Amino acid sequence: MATLSSNALTLADWAKRLDPEGKVPSIVELLAQNNEILADMQWIEGNLPTGHRTTVRTGLPTVAWRLLNQGVQPSKSVTAQVDESCGMLEAWSEVDKDLAMLNGNTAAFRLSEAQAFIEAMNQEMGQTVFYGNSGLAPEEFNGLSVRYSSLSAANGQNIINAGGAGSDNTSIWLICWGQQTVHGIFPKGSKAGLIHEDLGEVTVETSAGIAGTRLRAYQDHWQWKCGVALKDWRYAVRIANIDVSN
């Protein structure tokens, strides 16, 4: 049984979402960020239940010019397999049934709350595509910044240092999305994109008032399983250390 936490919507929250006529207006997401990256990047289904195993070419074969009656040595390319993991981004929404039913605006009220969750999931996903680091947060997938973080690394030639030394530096990315270059992934056998489950009316335990008491609430579940696969580092360039205060 779920527990309705102190993060649940209150009557005051509900009142703030009504216009003078008692209807639920469209809410402008003032904190919204434009994450066109999520629509621009290409996505493929992974070949693993937890992500995607990709083969990366790490070395080219040796070739040579030859003279008549002289041969050349055979050679081969060198490859390596890399397992890219996916993360599970989730959220739960629980609204007191009677609170949602006030003034008969149940559907509109739940929709306004759903839009907030969609925006939050969208922003978090866009943030993780660039700054995810499973070394610091094991629940995340590795984003692009952790892969382009050292000028002395093999892909350091694709990192341009803008020279900023402040604490508010940012980066500009140039990415050629593609199935053979850089792309998004989702686990094998799963659905792509943001998944929403309307679990309807359920009984939840509330932490407000007397502990252990129960109430009826509308419950929604949100989930997004995704990751990033970097197959060819030559197709992404990072212009790093841009001082935004100057």
Put a short name on every predicted segment.
Residues 2-39, 52, 77-246:
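Core alpha/beta structural scaffold of self-assembling particle/tube/pore-forming proteins
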